[in-house]
Swiss-Prot record:
Note: A synonymy between H.magnifica and R.crispa is controversial.
GO cellular component assignments: extracellular region; nematocyst
UniProt KW keywords: Calcium channel impairing toxin, Disulfide bond, Ion channel impairing toxin, Nematocyst, Neurotoxin, Potassium channel impairing toxin, Proton-gated sodium channel impairing toxin, Secreted, Toxin, Voltage-gated calcium channel impairing toxin, Voltage-gated potassium channel impairing toxin, Voltage-gated sodium channel impairing toxin
Subcellular location: Secreted; Nematocyst
Record protein name field: Pi-stichotoxin-Hcr5b
Source superkingdom: Eukaryota
The keyword Mitochondrion is assigned to this record: no
One term of GO molecular function: sodium channel regulator activity
Signal peptide stretch: none
Family of the protein in this entry: Belongs to the sea anemone type 3 (BDS) potassium channel toxin family.
Function summary: Remarkably non-selective toxin, with activity on many different ion channels. Weakly and reversibly inhibits rat and human homomeric ASIC1 (isoform ASIC1a) (IC(50)=4.8 uM, and IC(50)=14.6 uM), and ASIC3 (IC(50)=15.9 uM). Molecular modeling interaction with ASIC1a suggests that this peptide hinders the collapse of acidic pockets and stabilizes nonconducting channels state. It activates several potassium channels including Kv1.1/KCNA1, Kv1.2/KCNA2, and drosophila Shaker IR.
UniProt-listed SUPFAM superfamilies: Defensin-like
Entry-linked Pfam families: Defensin_4
Length: 41
């Protein structure tokens, strides 16, 4: 995925998702244009 920033962290941008996918260990997210930014802290 595309890198994105979320609360000062670098995360992964997921296109057209309303929430972070399970199984990746994400514990922080930010709403993004047409998707979501998911971060593993």
């Amino acid at each position: 995925g595309t890198p994105c920033k979320c609360h000062g962290y670098i995360g992964v941008y997921w296109f057209m998702l309303a929430g972070c996918p399970n199984g990746y260990g994400y514990n922080l997210s930010c709403p993004y244009f047409l998707g979501i930014c998911c971060v593993k802290k």
